[in-house]
Swiss-Prot record:
Protein's name in the database: MSDIN-like toxin proprotein 5
Entry keyword set: Toxin
Propeptide stretches in the record: 1-10, 21-34
Organism classification: Eukaryota, Fungi, Dikarya, Basidiomycota, Agaricomycotina
Cysteine disulfide partners in this protein: none
Family: Belongs to the MSDIN fungal toxin family.
Length: 34
């Protein structure tokens, strides 16, 4: 189980960083559009 958790950790961390980056990109596009 520890091997599976260790293998999934980078994936979970990577996924947790996606929403803020995507939200920032969307806000920049909306700001430029306005």
């Amino acid at each position: 189980m520890s091997d599976i958790n260790t293998a999934r950790l980078p994936y979970v961390v990577f996924m947790s960083f996606i929403p803020p980056c995507v939200n920032d990109d969307i806000q920049v596009v909306l700001t430029r559009g306005e």
